[in-house]
From Swiss-Prot:
Its cofactor is Mg(2+). This is Enolase. It comes from the Bacteria. Keywords: Cytoplasm, Glycolysis, Lyase, Magnesium, Metal-binding, Secreted. NCBIfam families: eno. It catalyses: (2R)-2-phosphoglycerate = phosphoenolpyruvate + H2O. Belongs to the enolase family. Its EC number is 4.2.1.11. Catalyzes the reversible conversion of 2-phosphoglycerate (2-PG) into phosphoenolpyruvate (PEP). It is essential for the degradation of carbohydrates via glycolysis. It is an enzyme of class 4 (lyase). Mg(2+) binds at residues 243, 289, 316. One of its GO terms (biological process) is glycolytic process. Its main location: cytoplasm.
Amino acid sequence: MSLITDIIAREVLDSRGNPTLEAEVITELGGFGRGMVPSGASTGEHEAVELRDGDKSRFGGKGTTKAVANVNDVIAKALVGKFDVTDQRAIDQAMIELDGTENKGKLGANAILAVSIAAARAAADELGVPLFSYLGGANSYVLPTPMMNVINGGAHSANKVDFQEFMIMPVGAPTVKEAIRYGAETFHALKKLLEADGKATSVGDEGGFAPDFADNEEPLKYLIRAIEAAGYKPGKDIAIAVDVASSELYDAATKTYKLRWSTGDEFTTPEFIKYLEDLADRYPIISIEDPIDENEWEDWAEITSELGKKVQLVGDDFFVTNTQYLQKGINMGAANSILIKVNQIGTLTETFEAIEMAKEAGYTAIVSHRSGETEDTTISDLVVATNAGQIKTGSLSRTDRIAKYNQLIRIEELLDTTAQYKGIHSFYNLSAAAREAIQAK
């Protein structure tokens, strides 16, 4: 047993230059851990509360000094000298009870999560084991198939593309190191194609390109060209994933989806489902995130009934990494995958519970970054610890994204011959026939 002897928090900056929270945990045997918290641009209505100061004279109101004070003055007093650093569940539960709200609005999910991560890292440090091994034990061996966001749109950019993310997934790679190479080579091939066509190659929040396109289909055509230019086969070697972020397009009053940034076209829900199905039929699209507004549960069940056997349908804003919402979705047959964002729920313990619930229901779980990131690589360890099988951590540029990929390379090297990269088989929520059909496109 090793008690926590000190907890320290401070305000630092994220990848967008906005303030965020960093916490450090120190133990009586010299264990040390640090946790940094990301933040999102496109956030779900039901996410745990990210506590900000609201003082417009400082960081435009986005300061985190209140959350820092909650760690230093409230959480530290409750945990220091009272908890064994290796008792993650007890530490997280104590902070949840200390907050006492449904959405962690009193202390802030950012304050709680920073300490949750730092405690896990301190425990791993004290025991002399990698974080993934500490969190997952001897059964942690699956390296994830990456979702690489190489074209940004929607709330993540200033262009005329409605969909928020266009991603490549190296489903045919033999290892995660090779998957990262496939992605990097395709990223650079895409840049050359854009430059040759006179399009901008500046990057968005997550490191992907954000040039203007005529509509939402043009980026898909560029991805196919880039995959081929890099020497790979679309579908077989590299599949495509998209994040529609449809809550940004939905008008609840008229119950329609409007392509507000591109063509201005409006769709009823059945028409929008058909629109997405048509794209999935014509391109090797293996995953669609948030295809339906986060509050339209019956419509989610409808799209899952129509498309869920042939494409992964991911709930992000829909589930917000919350087991209550996930269980409701499972009961209704809504979605077949959940996006896991640790700061949507606020503790590692609750994150593990969401991943386990998803797996038991046959849903995939995709461990994800946020658009406002830091150099913290916890999600790389988390995805291996849970054998989740898929990770979404941005493009092949910007150090805040690359840090996660580099950590996966290190983990694969540590695991050596026990490491498994599932690739196309990480989509266990799809039938073998559906996986084969995507790879044949």
